[in-house]
From Swiss-Prot:
It comes from Pyrococcus horikoshii (strain ATCC 700860 / DSM 12428 / JCM 9974 / NBRC 100139 / OT-3). Pfam families: FtsZ_C, Tubulin. Keywords: Cell cycle, Cell division, Cytoplasm, GTP-binding, Nucleotide-binding, Septation. The lineage of its organism: Archaea, Methanobacteriati, Methanobacteriota, Thermococci, Thermococcales. The keyword Acetylation does not apply. It comes from the Archaea. GTP binds at residues 130-132, 169, 173, 216. PANTHER family: CELL DIVISION PROTEIN FTSZ 2, CELL DIVISION PROTEIN FTSZ-RELATED. InterPro entries: Cell_div_FtsZ, Cell_div_FtsZ_CS, FtsZ/CetZ, FtsZ_C, Tub_FtsZ_C, Tubulin/FtsZ_2-layer-sand-dom, Tubulin/FtsZ_GTPase_sf, Tubulin_FtsZ_GTPase. The keyword GTP-binding applies. The gene is ftsZ2. This is Cell division protein FtsZ 2. SMART domains: Tubulin, Tubulin_C. It is found in: Cytoplasm.
Length: 414
C-alpha cells in the first residue's frame, strides 16, 4: 500500500508514542532568526494542532483558536485563545460562519497580540462549518494588518491549509466552504485546499472517522516537513527565503505527497507526488518548485539526486527548483516526497479571474491569493447570503466567483 508508512505514523492500526515538546528542544539562537507559528482554527484545525504536538514538531509555536471552550480545553497546544467569549460564551458557533466571523472580529486585539512577531504563519482549518469557515479569513486579515500597522518592512507569509467537505456532507456545507475559501483567498499568500473525497480515493478502505485522521496527518506532516527543514539541521536544508520565493506571488500551485519503500523508492515517491489524475497540467520554463524528502538513515544522496532529475525533467531545465531532505529514524526504508509546484497551467481552467487558475494534485488543490483586500461590505455580502435554514442556496447573480471556478472544474455542481 502506497501510504503504509503515513498510516502507521498517523496511529492507524498502530499506536503512536506521544512526544512532549519542551523549550529546551528548540535550537536557541537559530530558532530566533525566523519565527514560525501554526494556528489551528475551529474543531478541525485544533485537531491538527494536537497531532502536530504529538508528532513533536520543533521550531514552531502551536496555537489553537476556537469558539468551543470544551473542545479547546482538550487540545494540546503552546497557546490557546477562546474566540468571541462575549458572543458565544464558549459554546461554539453552531455551524454558522457568521458567528465564527463575528467571534474573531470581537477578539481582534487578542489575535493581533498573538501574531505580531511571526515571519511565517500557517493557518489550518476545516471549511464548511462555523468557526473554521468564518474566523480563519478574519485571522488571516488581522495578521497582514498587524504587520502594516507596526510598520514592519515585510509582511509575514501566510499559508492557509484547509480541508474541503466530503460530497456526502451535503450542499449546504459545501456552499459554506466555497464562501469561506473565497474570503480566505483575499488574505492568504497561498491557500492549499485538501479535498476530502480525493483522500478517500488514495485510501478507499478507511472508515470515515479514520479518514478524517488521515487528512489531519497529511496536513500535519506537510507543515512539519516545511517547518523543520527551515529550523533544524537537515540532510539538505531549505531556508525561509526559498519558501518565500515559491509561495509569495508564485501563481497557481500544485501540491502532491507520495511515498515508497520499493527498490527505486525515491524516484517512485516523487512520481507519486507528481501524479495528477484530474487535469492535464503543462509545465513551462517559468515554473518554480519546492521539493522536500523525508527519509530513513540509509537513504543516499545519489537516490535523491536521481529523483530530482525527474522533477527537472517535468518542469524543464530553466525552472527554479528548491529542495531539501530530512532524516527521520522511524521512516525505516520508506522515502516520502512532498512537491509544491507554482506557475502550473491547465487548458481546462476557464474564466477571466485574477486568481485565474486552480489545479489538483492527487490529493490537493492550491490557490494563490489575490492581492486585493476584500472590503467589509463584501464580507457581509458573502456571509449574509449563507443561511442553513434557507430552502434555496445562492444562485444566478448572487453566485460568487469561487462558485464559477468550482463549476468550471466540475468540482461539485450545485
Amino acid at each position: 500500500m502506497v501510504f503504509d508508512k503515513l498510516l502507521e505514523q498517523a496511529g492507524i492500526n498502530l499506536e503512536f508514542e506521544d512526544k512532549e515538546i519542551k523549550d529546551s528542544d528548540y535550537l536557541g539562537d537559530v530558532s530566533d532568526l525566523i519565527k514560525i507559528a501554526v494556528i489551528g482554527v475551529g474543531g478541525s484545525g485544533n485537531n491538527t494542532i494536537s497531532r502536530l504536538y504529538d508528532l513533536g514538531v520543533q521550531g514552531a509555536d502551536l496555537i489553537a483558536m476556537n469558539t468551543d471552550a470544551q473542545h479547546l480545553h482538550q487540545i494540546k497546544a503552546h497557546k490557546k485563545l477562546l474566540l468571541g467569549k462575549s458572543i458565544t460564551h464558549g459554546k461554539g458557533s453552531g455551524g454558522d460562519p457568521r458567528i465564527g466571523y463575528r467571534a474573531a472580529e470581537a477578539s481582534a486585539s487578542e489575535i493581533a497580540d498573538i501574531v505580531k512577531d511571526y515571519d511565517l504563519i500557517f493557518l489550518t482549518a476545516g471549511m464548511g462549518n462555523g468557526t473554521g469557515t468564518g474566523a480563519t479569513p478574519v485571522i488571516a486579515r488581522i495578521i497582514k494588518e498587524t504587520a502594516r500597522n507596526n510598520g514592519l518592512p515585510q509582511e509575514p507569509l501566510v499559508i492557509s491549509v484547509v480541508t474541503f467537505p466530503f460530497k456526502m456532507e451535503g450542499k449546504v456545507r459545501i456552499e459554506k466552504a466555497k464562501a469561506g475559501i473565497e474570503m480566505l483567498l483575499e488574505y492568504s499568500d497561498t491557500v492549499i485546499i485538501i479535498q476530502n473525497d480525493k483522500l478517500i480515493e488514495l485510501v478507499p478502505k478507511l472508515p470515515i472517522q479514520v479518514a478524517f485522521r488521515f487528512a489531519d496527518e497529511i496536513i500535519a506532516r506537510m507543515v512539519k516537513g516545511i517547518v523543520e527543514t527551515i529550523k533544524l539541521p537537515s540532510m539538505v536544508n531549505i531556508d525561509y527565503a526559498d519558501i518565500y520565493s515559491v509561495m509569495k506571488g508564485g501563481g497557481p500551485a500544485l501540491i502532491g505527497i507520495g511515498e515508497s519503500d520499493s527498490n527505486n523508492r525515491a524516484v517512485d515517491a516523487v512520481m507519486e507526488a507528481l501524479n495528477n489524475k484530474m487535469l492535464d497540467i503543462e509545465f513551462g520554463s517559468g515554473d518554480k518548485a519546492l521539493v522536500h524528502f523525508t527519509v530513513g538513515p540509509d537513504v543516499s544522496l545519489e537516490e535523491i539526486t536521481k529523483a530530482m532529475e525527474i522533477v527537472y525533467e517535468r518542469l524543464g531545465e530553466k525552472s527554479e527548483i528548491k529542495w531539501g531532505a530530512m532524516i527521520e529514524e522511524d521512516m525505516g526504508k520508506t522515502v516520502r516526497a512532498m512537491v509544491i509546484m507554482t506557475g502550473v497551467r491547465s487548458p481546462q481552467i476557464l474564466g477571466n479571474i485574477n486568481v485565474n487558475a486552480l489545479t489538483y494534485s492527487s490529493s490537493s488543490l492550491v490557490v494563490p491569493r489575490d492581492s486585493k483586500i476584500m472590503s467589509e461590505s463584501k464580507v457581509d455580502e458573502i456571509f449574509s447570503s449563507i443561511d442553513p435554514r434557507a430552502s434555496k442556496l445562492r444562485k444566478g447573480n448572487n453566485s460568487s466567483r469561487i462558485n464559477k471556478i468550482f463549476k468550471d472544474l466540475g468540482f461539485y455542481e450545485l
